[in-house]
Amino acid sequence: MDQAHFDEDRDELLTRIHEENVSYIMNPGVDIETSEAAIALAEKYDWIYAAVAYYPQETRFLDEEKFARIKELAQHPKVVAIGEIGLDYYWEDTPHDVQQYWFRRQIQLAIELGKPICIHDREAHGDVMRILDEEGAFEKTRVLMHCYSGSAPMAKELLAKGCYFSIAGPVTY
């Protein structure tokens, strides 16, 4: 909701969708700039909340200094989750090992701060499941699969582990 193409009519749009009984929005960041924007929008509306993180494709730009800023932002009272985090192997511009390293670090941050995680999983199902299991995510925090393109049997396995699912873009293709 904080993206530039909403600038012209954002307030009108948000008023309208709230009148249509949308009770809450969790607006995720994909880097520092968008995480800060998500918080700014959440501060403006009592029914909008933010999630902060580095999106898988953006982790190639992430370093310890930027991670420290994400940790700082994550402690804001309107930040309710760490996300959108995960792995995206569809695009080849960020090495898998870089994505995996920062995925783990962001899971650990969520656990440390007691916040749920919002997961992006595109063409990386086995590695996402393995890392979530190895980090104890299902036992130590709540897990929301936001972008999910895996199989029905894997979805059932995730549900059995207590995972939540949102309706996201992949249902359209």
Regions from the PLM with identified roles:
Residues 1-173:
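Mid-domain alpha/beta scaffold segments of enzyme catalytic cores
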